[in-house]
Each structure stands twice: as structure tokens, then as C-alpha cells.
Amino acid sequence: MDYREFFSQFKYLSEKPGIGGRIKAQPEDFIVMEEPLRSAFDGKKYAIFLLKKRNWDTMAAVKEIAKRAGISYKDIGFAGTKDRHAVTYQYISVPRDAKEKVEAVRIKDIELRFVSYGRALKLGHLLGNRFKIIVRDVDESAFERTKEIVRELRSKGGFPNYFGYQRFGERRVTNHLIGKLLLKGDFEGAARLFLGAHGGGMEGDEARKNFWETGDVNRALEEFPGFLRYERAMLYRYKETGSWRKAFLSLPLPIMRIFIHAYQSYLFNLYISRRIEEGLPLNEALVGDIVVQIKGGIPYRDRTYRVTETNIDFVKEKIRKDEAMVSGPLFGFSMRRARGVPGRLEEELLAEENLSLKDFKRLPKPMAEPGGRRELLIRPLGLTYGYVPSVGMCFRFFLPKGVYATSVLREIMKDH
């Protein structure tokens, strides 16, 4: 299953036909500029650089910079991962005494510019991202169709805040399935899927297919290419211990958490889709809903309150004034649960998946996931668009952190 087939299960909010087209035909068609928190520049222990990269994934770029500078990649901080097939600008931090080494680094398709001194950057330490995106292979009529779709979505409160396909895997859509197996304590099943899932014409697929069919660890170690370093490390660990649990837990923690987060994201997407399917509003609070506070267009997901018969008019006014948004579940052991009709939808999803919130606590401690809430709608700030002859549609907008530009474009393009 590729990501298009996978996403076909999630309902569109807009009913108007999409413009079609194609994104990321070339890296310059997808430009991302990170907006840092002001506090990133407080302090003097770290040197802050602006990293421009083209066709590089963030982690690969960081590791290459560290290698060339002669420092540990763990000493390089960054606030968020950015698309690979794009031109992206983001901030990184390095220890102050490594400043000159990093300034001397020269790598194809990577540029580094010292900006300021500040503090060590960590994941999540950003406001959001600005985007400039070109959709190609559309004609001039795409402008009017875009206008109609945007008008319809504004009347419905915004764009559905689906997690994008990047969360699940573009060619091997398995991250959420591995996450579910981990939650069920099936480390062998999770490891076999991680190692053996194949398809999409990727290098190493033949070796993965052979392992999927035979489960032969020794053969896999002979056949798996060297760049599949996490897979090979897992296979070696299994050979040493005979335990798939120990083998899986040998993966770096950030990699393991990707799978749990992907499963949370899948359930959140299902919740939005189910709400659309049942005709329940995404921009209007129902009794039992949990809403998140909004300030300056930025959601504060740790500031929530429940909608009751008593406060519902007050909440609706807050939503009307863009000071609050209805939220959906990021299931976890301490997530604040909805009640009423929204609560019923949450319970139905858990029942269908044979899942309990306690399952998220039974995970090995570093992976245990408390969960939280996430707003159901996206309201892109400063959204502008236009048709450029012989090029296509050009879109510009800002999104808060953790929100996917591809989910905005999905409603307009109707491409997956």
C-alpha cells in the first residue's frame, strides 16, 4: 500500500473538486523557512547558524556537518526536522568553541551562516514554518477552483489538521502498524515488519522480501545493504541475544518513538475523518469536547478546558474570535478525555483497535506516551495564492509547529 491508497480512508472536508497537479517536481518548488522562538537567541554558550539545505534530510545533514567539523552529531541541536525533497532554512546550535570549525564546513547543497549566540536548540523549540509552494501541471482555471475551495473551507472553520503522509512513510506505509504491535507487546511482530516490509521500488527491497518470507537472520545479515544500519544493528542484536524485544529496544529512542507517534497520528486522523463522516462540526464545540487555547494563531495544546452545558456559549464565542479550537485525541496514558458525543467517538476508536489508554503506559519506560490533545483544524496564516503562467499555482502561508503543509494542499489538490 502506498500513501495515496492509505490516505483514501480519510475524508476531505471540502466537497468541491480539487485542482490536481503535482508538488515537489523540483526542490525549489517547496521552500520552507523556520520561525524560531525568540528565546533561542538568549544566552552565549552556543553558536546559532542558519542552515540552508537542498535535497537533504535534516538528520543526514546534521551528521555530515558534524563529521566534517570533527564534532559529535549529538552536539548539534535543531528545533524540527524538515522535508528532504525541498529547499529548507532552519536554525542549528553548536557549542560555542565549535563555531569556527562549523564555519569552515563546505558541503554540496548545504550552506551555513552564523547568526548569533544563544542556547542549545531542542526539538519543538520553534513557532512554526513559512512555506512557498508551487503546484505544477495545472491550468489557469486552477485559480478560480482554489478560490472556491478556500472560501468553502473558511466557512467551515479551516482545513482539517490531518497528520501528513510523511508521518507514516511514503512508500512503505508501516510506521503506524509497527507502533500498534509495540503497544500490544508484540516485539517480534514489530521487528519482522520493520525488517521485512518491502515495496515501492526501494533499494534493499529484495533483501527485505527474502527476510519476510524466510525469517533467516544470517541470510539477512549477508544481504541487507550497509546503509540499512538500524536494520543490521537489530539483526546483530537478535543474533547475540535471541530476543526480538532486546533487538528492537537496541534502536535509538527517537526511532522507536516514531512508531508510537505514527500510531497516535493514525488514530487522530481517523477521529477527524469519523467526525466529518458523521456530520459533526470541526469548528463548533459540542458538549463534552475539549478545546485548546489559541493566541496569535498559535495553539497552546497544554492549555485545555472541557465544554459543558454551562460554558458552551462562552466557548463558542472564544472559537468565533479565534481564541480557541476544538481538539481531537492524541491517545496516551494521561490524555484528557472528551465526553458526550465526542467521547463516544473516542471510545469507539479505542474499542475498534482493541486498545486501552493503559497500553501506552505498559511500554518500556522511555517510550511510554502520555498523549495529549491536538486542534482539529488548520488556519494557515497569511495564505496567498496565484497562478503563474507556464509554472502553475504558487501558495504562501505560515503554519504552527507540528502542522503539515501537505495536509493544506491535499484539500486543494485532492491528490491523495
Curated annotation (Swiss-Prot):
Cystine bridges: none
EC number of the protein: 5.4.99.27
Catalytic activity annotation: uridine(13) in tRNA = pseudouridine(13) in tRNA
Domain TRUD: 158-379
Keywords: Isomerase, tRNA processing
EC category: isomerase
Top-level taxon of origin: Archaea
InterPro entries referenced in this protein's UniProt entry, alphabetically: PsdUridine_synth_cat_dom_sf, PsdUridine_synth_TruD, PsdUridine_synth_TruD_CS, PsdUridine_synth_TruD_insert, TruD_catalytic
Catalytic site: 83
GO molecular function: RNA binding; tRNA pseudouridine(13) synthase activity
Pfam families hit by this protein: TruD (PF01142)
GO biological process per UniProt: tRNA pseudouridine synthesis
Family: Belongs to the pseudouridine synthase TruD family.
Function: Could be responsible for synthesis of pseudouridine from uracil-13 in transfer RNAs.
Protein's UniProt name: Probable tRNA pseudouridine synthase D
Lineage per the UniProt record: Archaea, Methanobacteriati, Methanobacteriota, Thermococci, Thermococcales
